[in-house]
Amino acid sequence: MLRWTTAGESHGRALVAMVEGMVAGVHVTTQDISAQLARRRLGYGRGARMKFEQDQVTMLTGLRHGVTLGGPIAIEIGNTEWPKWETVMAPDPVDPAVLADSAARNAPLTRPRPGHADYAGMLKYGFDDARPVLERASARETAARVAAGTVARAFLQQALGVEIVSHVISIGASKPYDGPPPQAADLTAIDASPVRAFDAASEALMIDEIEAAKRDGDTLGGVVEVVAHGLPVGLGSFTSGDNRLDSQLAGAVMGIQAIKGVEIGDGFETARRRGSVAHDEIYPGADGVMRSTNRAGGLEGGMTNGLPVRVRAAMKPISTVPRALATVDMATGEEAVAIHQRSDVCAVPAAAVVVETMVALVLARAVLEKFGGDSLAETRANIDSYLRAVATREPSTDGARASG
Protein backbone atom coordinates (compact mmCIF):
# COMPACT_ATOMS: atom_id res chain seq x y z
CA MET A 1 0.00 0.00 0.00
CA LEU A 2 1.31 3.42 -0.96
CA ARG A 3 1.37 5.75 2.05
CA TRP A 4 2.52 9.30 2.54
CA THR A 5 2.82 11.82 5.34
CA THR A 6 4.46 15.16 6.03
CA ALA A 7 6.14 16.74 9.05
CA GLY A 8 7.28 20.22 9.93
CA GLU A 9 6.12 23.73 10.76
CA SER A 10 5.80 26.80 8.57
CA HIS A 11 8.75 28.60 10.21
CA GLY A 12 10.59 25.50 11.40
CA ARG A 13 13.97 24.30 10.18
CA ALA A 14 12.45 22.23 7.38
CA LEU A 15 9.47 20.33 6.06
CA VAL A 16 9.79 16.60 5.49
CA ALA A 17 7.77 14.38 3.14
CA MET A 18 7.69 10.61 3.57
CA VAL A 19 6.53 8.18 0.87
CA GLU A 20 6.31 4.47 1.68
CA GLY A 21 5.34 1.65 -0.66
CA MET A 22 6.74 3.04 -3.91
CA VAL A 23 8.21 0.39 -6.20
CA ALA A 24 11.88 0.30 -7.15
CA GLY A 25 13.03 1.59 -10.50
CA VAL A 26 11.14 4.88 -10.78
CA HIS A 27 13.28 7.71 -12.11
CA VAL A 28 12.88 10.94 -10.13
CA THR A 29 15.41 13.62 -9.20
CA THR A 30 15.86 16.61 -6.95
CA GLN A 31 15.42 18.76 -10.05
CA ASP A 32 12.03 17.16 -10.76
CA ILE A 33 10.82 18.02 -7.28
CA SER A 34 12.25 21.55 -7.43
CA ALA A 35 10.45 22.12 -10.73
CA GLN A 36 7.10 21.12 -9.23
CA LEU A 37 7.73 23.28 -6.16
CA ALA A 38 8.46 26.23 -8.45
CA ARG A 39 5.04 25.69 -10.04
CA ARG A 40 3.49 25.84 -6.57
CA ARG A 41 4.96 29.35 -6.15
CA LEU A 42 3.29 30.60 -9.34
CA GLY A 43 0.32 32.89 -9.44
CA TYR A 44 -0.89 36.46 -9.67
CA GLY A 45 -1.74 37.78 -6.21
CA ARG A 46 0.89 35.87 -4.23
CA GLY A 47 2.47 37.56 -1.20
CA ALA A 48 6.01 38.69 -0.42
CA ARG A 49 7.03 35.27 0.93
CA MET A 50 7.11 33.85 -2.61
CA LYS A 51 9.98 36.24 -3.45
CA PHE A 52 12.39 34.60 -1.02
CA GLU A 53 10.92 31.13 -0.50
CA GLN A 54 13.48 28.98 -2.28
CA ASP A 55 12.38 25.44 -1.33
CA GLN A 56 15.82 23.91 -0.82
CA VAL A 57 15.27 20.22 -1.63
CA THR A 58 17.37 17.41 -0.15
CA MET A 59 16.65 13.77 -0.94
CA LEU A 60 17.38 12.00 2.34
CA THR A 61 16.52 8.36 1.71
CA GLY A 62 15.00 5.92 -0.75
CA LEU A 63 16.84 6.87 -3.93
CA ARG A 64 20.20 6.16 -5.50
CA HIS A 65 21.41 8.01 -8.57
CA GLY A 66 17.92 9.30 -9.30
CA VAL A 67 16.15 5.93 -9.08
CA THR A 68 13.83 4.71 -6.31
CA LEU A 69 15.08 1.73 -4.29
CA GLY A 70 11.76 0.34 -3.07
CA GLY A 71 12.22 1.52 0.52
CA PRO A 72 10.76 4.55 2.31
CA ILE A 73 11.53 7.85 0.57
CA ALA A 74 12.26 10.91 2.73
CA ILE A 75 12.50 14.38 1.21
CA GLU A 76 13.53 17.51 3.12
CA ILE A 77 12.58 21.04 2.11
CA GLY A 78 14.71 23.54 3.98
CA ASN A 79 13.37 26.85 5.26
CA THR A 80 15.49 29.76 4.00
CA GLU A 81 14.10 31.94 6.83
CA TRP A 82 15.17 29.54 9.58
CA PRO A 83 17.95 31.81 10.94
CA LYS A 84 15.29 34.44 11.76
CA TRP A 85 13.13 31.89 13.58
CA GLU A 86 15.75 29.59 15.08
CA THR A 87 15.21 30.87 18.61
CA VAL A 88 11.41 31.20 18.56
CA MET A 89 10.86 27.81 16.90
CA ALA A 90 13.71 25.90 18.57
CA PRO A 91 12.70 22.29 19.42
CA ASP A 92 14.70 22.35 22.67
CA PRO A 93 14.13 24.71 25.62
CA VAL A 94 15.55 28.23 25.21
CA ASP A 95 16.93 30.44 27.96
CA PRO A 96 14.30 33.14 28.72
CA ALA A 97 16.95 35.85 28.42
CA VAL A 98 17.81 34.65 24.92
CA LEU A 99 14.13 34.34 24.01
CA ALA A 100 13.56 37.93 25.15
CA ASP A 101 15.77 39.10 22.29
CA SER A 102 13.11 37.73 19.93
CA ALA A 103 10.20 39.29 21.80
CA ALA A 104 8.44 40.57 18.68
CA ARG A 105 8.37 37.20 16.94
CA ASN A 106 7.64 35.35 20.18
CA ALA A 107 4.72 37.55 21.28
CA PRO A 108 1.63 35.42 22.03
CA LEU A 109 -0.94 35.40 19.23
CA THR A 110 -4.22 35.49 21.13
CA ARG A 111 -6.63 36.91 18.53
CA PRO A 112 -7.77 33.97 16.35
CA ARG A 113 -8.54 34.56 12.69
CA PRO A 114 -12.08 33.65 11.58
CA GLY A 115 -11.85 30.88 9.01
CA HIS A 116 -8.47 29.62 10.22
CA ALA A 117 -7.57 26.75 12.56
CA ASP A 118 -6.55 29.20 15.33
CA TYR A 119 -9.66 29.18 17.56
CA ALA A 120 -10.53 25.48 17.53
CA GLY A 121 -6.86 24.50 17.66
CA MET A 122 -6.16 26.61 20.74
CA LEU A 123 -9.12 25.12 22.60
CA LYS A 124 -8.56 21.53 21.46
CA TYR A 125 -4.85 21.36 22.31
CA GLY A 126 -4.85 23.65 25.34
CA PHE A 127 -2.67 26.39 23.84
CA ASP A 128 -2.86 29.98 25.07
CA ASP A 129 -1.14 31.12 21.87
CA ALA A 130 -2.15 30.47 18.24
CA ARG A 131 1.49 30.11 17.13
CA PRO A 132 1.64 26.31 17.61
CA VAL A 133 -1.60 25.96 15.63
CA LEU A 134 -0.88 28.19 12.68
CA GLU A 135 2.66 26.84 12.26
CA ARG A 136 1.37 23.38 11.37
CA ALA A 137 -1.98 24.43 9.86
CA SER A 138 -0.27 26.80 7.42
CA ALA A 139 -0.52 26.06 3.70
CA ARG A 140 3.28 26.08 3.68
CA GLU A 141 2.88 22.38 4.55
CA THR A 142 1.65 21.76 1.00
CA ALA A 143 5.22 22.14 -0.25
CA ALA A 144 5.96 18.77 1.35
CA ARG A 145 2.88 17.27 -0.29
CA VAL A 146 4.07 18.50 -3.68
CA ALA A 147 7.42 16.83 -3.07
CA ALA A 148 5.71 13.52 -2.27
CA GLY A 149 3.37 13.92 -5.20
CA THR A 150 6.26 14.38 -7.61
CA VAL A 151 7.30 10.80 -6.89
CA ALA A 152 3.73 9.63 -7.57
CA ARG A 153 3.57 11.60 -10.83
CA ALA A 154 6.83 10.06 -12.01
CA PHE A 155 5.51 6.57 -11.25
CA LEU A 156 2.21 7.18 -13.07
CA GLN A 157 3.95 8.55 -16.14
CA GLN A 158 6.54 5.79 -16.31
CA ALA A 159 4.12 2.94 -15.54
CA LEU A 160 1.14 4.01 -17.64
CA GLY A 161 1.97 7.19 -19.51
CA VAL A 162 -0.48 9.11 -17.31
CA GLU A 163 -0.27 12.90 -17.57
CA ILE A 164 -1.89 15.25 -15.05
CA VAL A 165 -2.74 18.86 -15.84
CA SER A 166 -4.63 21.54 -13.92
CA HIS A 167 -6.08 24.96 -14.63
CA VAL A 168 -8.05 27.64 -12.81
CA ILE A 169 -11.77 27.72 -13.65
CA SER A 170 -12.59 30.98 -11.84
CA ILE A 171 -11.34 33.40 -9.21
CA GLY A 172 -13.78 35.27 -7.01
CA ALA A 173 -16.86 36.23 -8.99
CA SER A 174 -15.22 35.94 -12.42
CA LYS A 175 -17.24 34.09 -15.07
CA PRO A 176 -16.25 30.41 -14.88
CA TYR A 177 -14.42 28.86 -17.82
CA ASP A 178 -16.79 26.38 -19.51
CA GLY A 179 -14.77 25.17 -22.50
CA PRO A 180 -13.13 21.79 -23.11
CA PRO A 181 -10.65 20.54 -20.50
CA PRO A 182 -6.94 20.96 -21.24
CA GLN A 183 -4.67 18.27 -22.63
CA ALA A 184 -1.22 17.45 -21.30
CA ALA A 185 0.34 19.49 -24.11
CA ASP A 186 -1.43 22.60 -22.78
CA LEU A 187 0.35 22.58 -19.41
CA THR A 188 3.25 24.83 -20.46
CA ALA A 189 0.88 27.51 -21.75
CA ILE A 190 -1.26 27.26 -18.61
CA ASP A 191 1.77 27.67 -16.35
CA ALA A 192 2.77 30.72 -18.40
CA SER A 193 -0.55 32.39 -17.52
CA PRO A 194 -0.25 34.56 -14.38
CA VAL A 195 -3.44 32.96 -13.04
CA ARG A 196 -2.93 29.55 -14.70
CA ALA A 197 -5.98 30.09 -16.91
CA PHE A 198 -6.66 28.03 -20.04
CA ASP A 199 -7.92 30.94 -22.15
CA ALA A 200 -7.15 34.64 -22.42
CA ALA A 201 -10.67 35.88 -21.74
CA SER A 202 -10.90 34.04 -18.43
CA GLU A 203 -7.40 35.19 -17.50
CA ALA A 204 -8.31 38.87 -17.90
CA LEU A 205 -11.43 38.51 -15.76
CA MET A 206 -9.51 36.73 -13.01
CA ILE A 207 -6.78 39.38 -12.91
CA ASP A 208 -9.44 42.10 -12.65
CA GLU A 209 -10.94 40.30 -9.65
CA ILE A 210 -7.56 40.07 -7.92
CA GLU A 211 -6.73 43.73 -8.53
CA ALA A 212 -10.09 44.82 -7.10
CA ALA A 213 -9.60 42.69 -3.98
CA LYS A 214 -6.07 44.03 -3.53
CA ARG A 215 -7.35 47.62 -3.66
CA ASP A 216 -9.98 46.78 -1.05
CA GLY A 217 -7.55 45.04 1.30
CA ASP A 218 -9.34 41.73 0.78
CA THR A 219 -8.68 38.15 -0.33
CA LEU A 220 -10.17 35.80 -2.92
CA GLY A 221 -10.86 32.12 -3.46
CA GLY A 222 -11.78 30.27 -6.61
CA VAL A 223 -12.31 26.98 -8.41
CA VAL A 224 -9.65 24.76 -10.00
CA GLU A 225 -9.84 21.65 -12.16
CA VAL A 226 -7.39 18.75 -12.45
CA VAL A 227 -7.51 16.36 -15.42
CA ALA A 228 -5.66 13.02 -15.48
CA HIS A 229 -5.16 11.53 -18.95
CA GLY A 230 -4.19 7.94 -19.75
CA LEU A 231 -5.79 5.91 -16.97
CA PRO A 232 -7.08 2.41 -17.77
CA VAL A 233 -10.54 1.06 -17.03
CA GLY A 234 -10.98 -0.49 -13.61
CA LEU A 235 -9.01 1.44 -10.98
CA GLY A 236 -11.00 1.59 -7.76
CA SER A 237 -14.00 -0.60 -6.97
CA PHE A 238 -17.76 -0.56 -6.45
CA THR A 239 -17.55 -3.13 -3.62
CA SER A 240 -17.57 -0.69 -0.70
CA GLY A 241 -17.59 3.03 -0.11
CA ASP A 242 -13.97 3.33 0.94
CA ASN A 243 -12.85 1.39 -2.15
CA ARG A 244 -14.55 3.84 -4.50
CA LEU A 245 -11.90 5.93 -6.19
CA ASP A 246 -14.05 9.05 -6.27
CA SER A 247 -14.46 8.91 -2.48
CA GLN A 248 -10.68 8.61 -2.08
CA LEU A 249 -10.04 11.53 -4.42
CA ALA A 250 -12.63 13.71 -2.70
CA GLY A 251 -11.20 12.96 0.74
CA ALA A 252 -7.62 13.68 -0.30
CA VAL A 253 -8.51 16.95 -2.02
CA MET A 254 -10.74 18.10 0.86
CA GLY A 255 -7.74 17.57 3.13
CA ILE A 256 -5.90 20.44 1.45
CA GLN A 257 -5.87 23.68 3.43
CA ALA A 258 -8.72 26.08 2.46
CA ILE A 259 -10.52 23.61 0.16
CA LYS A 260 -14.25 23.68 0.95
CA GLY A 261 -15.79 21.70 -1.89
CA VAL A 262 -14.95 18.94 -4.38
CA GLU A 263 -16.79 17.63 -7.41
CA ILE A 264 -16.03 14.85 -9.89
CA GLY A 265 -16.78 15.56 -13.53
CA ASP A 266 -19.74 17.91 -13.89
CA GLY A 267 -20.57 17.35 -10.23
CA PHE A 268 -23.20 19.74 -8.93
CA GLU A 269 -24.22 20.76 -12.44
CA THR A 270 -25.25 17.14 -13.05
CA ALA A 271 -27.75 17.43 -10.19
CA ARG A 272 -29.58 20.14 -12.14
CA ARG A 273 -30.01 17.98 -15.26
CA ARG A 274 -32.47 15.29 -16.20
CA GLY A 275 -31.14 11.77 -16.36
CA SER A 276 -31.50 11.66 -20.14
CA VAL A 277 -28.80 14.33 -20.51
CA ALA A 278 -26.76 13.71 -17.35
CA HIS A 279 -24.88 10.56 -18.31
CA ASP A 280 -22.27 9.56 -20.90
CA GLU A 281 -23.96 7.29 -23.43
CA ILE A 282 -21.97 4.33 -24.71
CA TYR A 283 -21.58 3.55 -28.42
CA PRO A 284 -19.80 0.81 -30.37
CA GLY A 285 -16.55 1.75 -32.06
CA ALA A 286 -13.79 0.14 -34.10
CA ASP A 287 -11.44 0.09 -31.09
CA GLY A 288 -14.05 -0.80 -28.48
CA VAL A 289 -16.78 1.25 -26.90
CA MET A 290 -16.71 5.04 -27.11
CA ARG A 291 -18.35 8.05 -25.49
CA SER A 292 -19.21 11.45 -26.90
CA THR A 293 -19.20 13.15 -23.47
CA ASN A 294 -17.37 12.87 -20.15
CA ARG A 295 -19.86 14.32 -17.69
CA ALA A 296 -19.00 11.66 -15.10
CA GLY A 297 -15.39 12.81 -15.05
CA GLY A 298 -13.96 9.42 -15.93
CA LEU A 299 -15.45 7.65 -12.89
CA GLU A 300 -18.55 5.46 -12.75
CA GLY A 301 -19.45 3.29 -9.76
CA GLY A 302 -16.23 4.29 -8.02
CA MET A 303 -14.07 3.01 -10.90
CA THR A 304 -12.20 4.60 -13.78
CA ASN A 305 -13.97 4.05 -17.10
CA GLY A 306 -11.09 4.84 -19.45
CA LEU A 307 -11.93 8.51 -19.97
CA PRO A 308 -9.88 11.34 -18.41
CA VAL A 309 -10.51 11.75 -14.69
CA ARG A 310 -11.73 15.27 -13.89
CA VAL A 311 -11.68 16.66 -10.35
CA ARG A 312 -12.70 20.19 -9.37
CA ALA A 313 -12.01 21.88 -6.04
CA ALA A 314 -13.36 25.08 -4.50
CA MET A 315 -10.90 27.11 -2.45
CA LYS A 316 -12.24 29.62 0.06
CA PRO A 317 -10.71 33.12 0.33
CA ILE A 318 -7.57 33.20 2.46
CA SER A 319 -8.56 33.77 6.09
CA THR A 320 -5.72 36.19 6.85
CA VAL A 321 -7.49 39.32 5.62
CA PRO A 322 -5.36 42.50 5.47
CA ARG A 323 -8.14 44.72 6.83
CA ALA A 324 -8.68 42.22 9.67
CA LEU A 325 -11.95 40.63 10.74
CA ALA A 326 -13.64 40.90 14.12
CA THR A 327 -12.66 38.34 16.74
CA VAL A 328 -12.20 37.89 20.49
CA ASP A 329 -8.90 38.16 22.34
CA MET A 330 -8.56 34.75 23.98
CA ALA A 331 -6.43 36.23 26.78
CA THR A 332 -8.92 38.92 27.84
CA GLY A 333 -12.27 37.86 26.37
CA GLU A 334 -12.65 41.31 24.85
CA GLU A 335 -13.65 42.21 21.31
CA ALA A 336 -10.62 42.61 19.03
CA VAL A 337 -9.44 42.44 15.43
CA ALA A 338 -7.83 39.25 14.16
CA ILE A 339 -4.06 38.84 13.98
CA HIS A 340 -2.57 39.53 10.56
CA GLN A 341 0.22 37.25 9.42
CA ARG A 342 1.88 37.90 6.06
CA SER A 343 -0.32 36.32 3.38
CA ASP A 344 -1.45 36.32 -0.24
CA VAL A 345 -4.41 38.09 -1.82
CA CYS A 346 -5.11 34.97 -3.86
CA ALA A 347 -3.44 31.55 -3.88
CA VAL A 348 -5.85 29.74 -6.20
CA PRO A 349 -3.29 29.16 -9.02
CA ALA A 350 -0.95 27.52 -6.50
CA ALA A 351 -3.81 25.49 -5.03
CA ALA A 352 -4.36 23.92 -8.46
CA VAL A 353 -0.82 22.51 -8.35
CA VAL A 354 -1.45 21.10 -4.87
CA VAL A 355 -4.69 19.47 -6.05
CA GLU A 356 -2.69 17.89 -8.88
CA THR A 357 -0.40 16.48 -6.21
CA MET A 358 -3.14 14.86 -4.17
CA VAL A 359 -4.81 13.45 -7.28
CA ALA A 360 -1.46 11.96 -8.34
CA LEU A 361 -0.90 10.34 -4.94
CA VAL A 362 -4.37 8.78 -4.83
CA LEU A 363 -4.13 7.52 -8.42
CA ALA A 364 -0.66 6.07 -7.83
CA ARG A 365 -1.99 4.24 -4.78
CA ALA A 366 -4.89 2.87 -6.82
CA VAL A 367 -2.53 1.66 -9.56
CA LEU A 368 -0.29 -0.10 -7.04
CA GLU A 369 -3.28 -1.68 -5.29
CA LYS A 370 -4.56 -3.00 -8.61
CA PHE A 371 -1.30 -4.12 -10.22
CA GLY A 372 1.19 -4.56 -7.36
CA GLY A 373 4.84 -5.31 -7.98
CA ASP A 374 8.13 -4.66 -6.23
CA SER A 375 9.73 -2.96 -9.24
CA LEU A 376 8.49 -0.68 -11.99
CA ALA A 377 9.22 -3.41 -14.53
CA GLU A 378 7.06 -5.91 -12.63
CA THR A 379 4.21 -3.40 -12.31
CA ARG A 380 4.40 -2.67 -16.03
CA ALA A 381 4.24 -6.38 -16.84
CA ASN A 382 1.15 -6.74 -14.66
CA ILE A 383 -0.44 -3.73 -16.33
CA ASP A 384 0.26 -5.10 -19.81
CA SER A 385 -1.29 -8.45 -18.88
CA TYR A 386 -4.41 -6.75 -17.54
CA LEU A 387 -4.80 -4.49 -20.56
CA ARG A 388 -4.58 -7.49 -22.89
CA ALA A 389 -7.25 -9.28 -20.89
CA VAL A 390 -9.52 -6.22 -20.93
CA ALA A 391 -9.06 -5.86 -24.69
CA THR A 392 -10.33 -9.40 -25.27
CA ARG A 393 -13.48 -8.69 -23.25
CA GLU A 394 -14.32 -5.36 -24.82
CA PRO A 395 -16.74 -5.49 -27.78
CA SER A 396 -15.44 -4.18 -31.10
CA THR A 397 -17.39 -3.39 -34.24
CA ASP A 398 -17.09 -1.35 -37.39
CA GLY A 399 -20.81 -0.74 -37.45
CA ALA A 400 -22.39 2.70 -37.37
CA ARG A 401 -24.24 4.09 -34.40
CA ALA A 402 -27.88 3.20 -34.11
CA SER A 403 -28.53 6.34 -32.06
CA GLY A 404 -26.85 9.47 -30.77
Swiss-Prot record:
Q: In which pathway does it act?
A: Metabolic intermediate biosynthesis; chorismate biosynthesis; chorismate from D-erythrose 4-phosphate and phosphoenolpyruvate: step 7/7
Q: Which reaction does it catalyse?
A: 5-O-(1-carboxyvinyl)-3-phosphoshikimate = chorismate + phosphate
InterPro entries xref list: Chorismate_synth, Chorismate_synth_AroC_sf, Chorismate_synthase_CS
Show the GO cellular component annotation of the record. cytosol
Q: Does the keyword Flavoprotein apply?
A: yes
Q: Does the keyword Secreted apply?
A: no
Question: Under which name does UniProt file this protein?
Answer: Chorismate synthase
Lineage at the top is: Bacteria, Bacillati, Actinomycetota, Actinomycetes, Mycobacteriales
